């Protein structure tokens, strides 16, 4: 069965090079002589989570289906582009889609993924964080099974910092007092990670970029307060020289090299430091993502990916069943164990698998997810994200003492973005 699928995949790849419309002709992930072979398009995880859960669910189906992962490019933009082209061509060779949390509005609005309902919906939303369910929903309908989620913590050097700061202003002040050892690592290159950073600051300040798929919010005073944080960091002594080109990995590497006292980053940073820089790792403290306004709780970033059933699958019924298995409690525990991916189910945060992966901070991760600020759900998300990046990058263009003009530019660009529903 596997060899026949490989032949079909090769034919599809050749057809893709000729024309996007030919992709649909390559559909058909079933072998008439056996159970449906479900193709699972998803980003690879280095620890092997996808292969392991696909194998287990296939075995547990008792011959009802087999799941074959088809790995997307490592770059998130290229992942989306490939899926947009295939789904836009009504490619029936895709059965299950691993969707970044920010794609839900776009894919659902385009009619590319199926709505979840009934027993399937109940099974995949049981004990799942409401904020995570929100990332899998569009216009009050569920379009994906929540699988893994993620959030950022404040990581700091316990040998340099006696008490972790509660606000960005406090952290910048502490960092500047530490001189060269006190830089702050964030994600501020011109890419989606910068949108994550900006959105978390705006949400933490008490407003949001969008209040609905096409409704711009961006209340002026709190938005300017968030922009002041970026400008103050970027133009002060706490900024590393590489701030405007920093991403999750470069931030991690700089922290592990002992170049910074503070870092906001995802949970993978802890395990990486323990393995790659144990002397730094043993001094690694953790705290909640800092506040923008001292009087308001922070709203940490929220990431992750969810599992959708393609509207063009020829095996939708079993695809829903398979996706339910891929997203179940056992699968989420596997994702924690093999790749350190936080589960979307709140009831797993006292499970030994999770507490061992996040020693001492499992409940902080849970709290951060519960009180996170998701990015907007809108069909025009890509345009909105690009608008934010264009308005606010490089970060040192923001004058913290005069943010009105940059606020006007940001709001204008976002308003233009929501008028379109660009797919590429």
Language model feature labels by segment:
Residues 232-238, 275-339:
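Extracytoplasmic/periplasmic substrate-recognition and gating elements
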Residues 84-86, 93-95, 124-156, 295-299, ...:
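A structural signal for short loop-to-beta-strand junctions that line the ligand-binding cleft
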Residues 175, 215-244, 289:
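Glycine-centered hinge/linker elements that transmit conformational signals in sensory
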Residues 101-151, 163, 170-172, 182, ...:
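Hinge/lid segment of periplasmic solute-binding proteins
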Residues 2-15, 19-105, 278, 293, ...:
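Conserved N-terminal structural module of periplasmic/extracytoplasmic solute-binding proteins
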Residues 367-424:
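Conserved C-terminal helix/tail region of periplasmic/extracytoplasmic solute-binding proteins
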Residues 71-83, 102, 169-170, 242-256:
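Short helix-initiation/N-cap motifs at beta->coil->alpha
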Residues 95-98, 261-266:
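Paired acidic/hydrophobic, glycine-rich loop segments that form the ligand-binding mouth/hinge
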């Amino acid at each position: 069965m596997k060899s026949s699928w490989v032949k079909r995949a090769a034919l599809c790849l050749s057809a893709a090079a000729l024309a996007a419309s030919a992709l649909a002709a390559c559909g058909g992930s079933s072998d008439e002589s056996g159970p449906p072979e479900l193709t699972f398009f998803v980003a690879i995880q280095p620890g092997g989570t996808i292969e392991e859960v696909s194998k287990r669910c296939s075995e547990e189906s008792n011959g009802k289906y087999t799941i074959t992962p088809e790995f997307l490019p490592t770059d998130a933009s290229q992942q989306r582009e490939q899926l947009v082209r295939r789904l836009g061509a009504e490619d029936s060779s895709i059965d299950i889609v691993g969707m970044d949390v920010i794609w839900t509005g776009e894919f659902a609005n385009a009619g590319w993924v199926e709505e979840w309902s009934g027993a399937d919906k109940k099974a995949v939303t049981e004990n799942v964080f409401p904020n995570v369910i929100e990332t899998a929903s569009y216009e009050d309908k569920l379009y994906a099974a929540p699988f893994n989620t993620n959030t950022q913590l404040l990581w700091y050097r316990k040998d340099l910092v006696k008490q972790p700061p509660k606000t960005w202003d406090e952290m910048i002040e502490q960092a500047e007092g530490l001189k060269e050892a006190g830089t702050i690592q964030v994600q501020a290159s011109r890419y989606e990670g910068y949108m994550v950073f900006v959105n978390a600051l705006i949400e933490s300040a008490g407003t949001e970029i969008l209040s609905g798929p096409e409704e711009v919010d961006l209340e002026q005073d709190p938005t300017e307060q968030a922009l002041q944080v970026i400008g103050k960091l970027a133009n002060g002594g706490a900024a590393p020289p590489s701030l405007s080109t920093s991403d999750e990995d470069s931030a991690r590497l700089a922290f592990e090299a002992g170049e910074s006292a503070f870092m906001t980053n995802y949970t993978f940073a802890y395990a990486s430091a323990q393995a790659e820089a144990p002397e730094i790792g043993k001094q690694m403290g953790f705290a909640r993502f800092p506040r923008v306004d001292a009087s308001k709780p922070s709203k940490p970033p929220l990431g992750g990916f969810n599992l959708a059933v393609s509207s063009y699958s020829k095996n939708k019924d079993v695809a829903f069943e398979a996706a339910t298995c891929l997203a179940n409690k056992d699968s989420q525990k596997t994702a924690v164990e093999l790749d350190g991916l936080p589960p979307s189910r709140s009831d797993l945060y006292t499970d030994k698998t999770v507490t061992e992966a996040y020693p001492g901070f499992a409940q902080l991760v849970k709290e951060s997810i519960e009180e996170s600020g998701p990015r907007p759900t809108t069909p025009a998300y890509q345009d909105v994200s690009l608008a934010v990046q264009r308005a606010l990058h490089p970060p040192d263009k923001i004058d913290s003492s005069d943010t009105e003009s940059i606020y006007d530019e940001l709001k204008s660009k976002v308003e233009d973005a929501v008028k379109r529903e660009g797919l590429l």
